[in-house]
Amino acid sequence: MIYQKQRNTAETQLNISISDDQSPSHINTGVGFLNHMLTLFTFHSGLSLNIEAQGDIDVDDHHVTEDIGIVIGQLLLEMIKDKKHFVRYGTMYIPMDETLARVVVDISGRPYLSFNATLSKEKVGTFDTELVEEFFRAVVINARLTTHIDLIRGGNTHHEIEAIFKAFSRALGIALTATDDQRVPSSKGVIE
């Protein structure tokens, strides 16, 4: 199933769709480094993502990065509500040469982000690295996930961020994996 949403504000105009059919993705955020990271997200999560975004990137990349995270989170929440029967938990360690990242995801209905990653530099190209945390906070809060992101070993800043995105994507993909178990994956009987 394809989940689609538009978001139009004074700062950004977004048209985003997500599906779990692994169809080809098209990503145009206007921010080259973010395009690269979201391409990795689609490959490693097994999700298809189509993004057409325009924003005030002449100011900086903050609004478009955060707003894309908000919409991806909202679409993931819709997908989760429709799935009902899924693994729920996902954990992944990803090395990227000298760096090592760990991400743990719980599709809990309780939004929480622990972001324990001191990135080596403030920029990768023109991209402000503090936006990595802003992006994940937007996704996690809007998808209602509990997520722990830890950069265990650092080095090259591009590698650090890439390892984090890959680990999150793989952990999310595991957590979203469908199961034959007809019970809601919570002893409460509900995930809200």
From Swiss-Prot:
GO terms for cellular component: cytoplasm. The keyword Amino-acid biosynthesis applies. GO terms for biological process: L-histidine biosynthetic process. Belongs to the imidazoleglycerol-phosphate dehydratase family. Gene3D superfamilies: Imidazole glycerol phosphate dehydratase, domain 1 (3.30.230.40). Pathway: Amino-acid biosynthesis; L-histidine biosynthesis; L-histidine from 5-phospho-alpha-D-ribose 1-diphosphate: step 6/9. NCBIfam families: PRK00951.1-2 (NF002107), PRK00951.2-1 (NF002111), PRK00951.2-4 (NF002114). It is found in: Cytoplasm. InterPro entries: IGPD_sf, ImidazoleglycerolP_deHydtase, ImidazoleglycerP_deHydtase_CS, Ribosomal_Su5_D2-typ_SF. It catalyses: D-erythro-1-(imidazol-4-yl)glycerol 3-phosphate = 3-(imidazol-4-yl)-2-oxopropyl phosphate + H2O. PROSITE patterns: IGP_DEHYDRATASE_1 (PS00954), IGP_DEHYDRATASE_2 (PS00955). It comes from the Bacteria. Keywords: Amino-acid biosynthesis, Cytoplasm, Histidine biosynthesis, Lyase. This is Imidazoleglycerol-phosphate dehydratase. It is an enzyme of class 4 (lyase). Its EC number is 4.2.1.19. GO terms for molecular function: imidazoleglycerol-phosphate dehydratase activity.
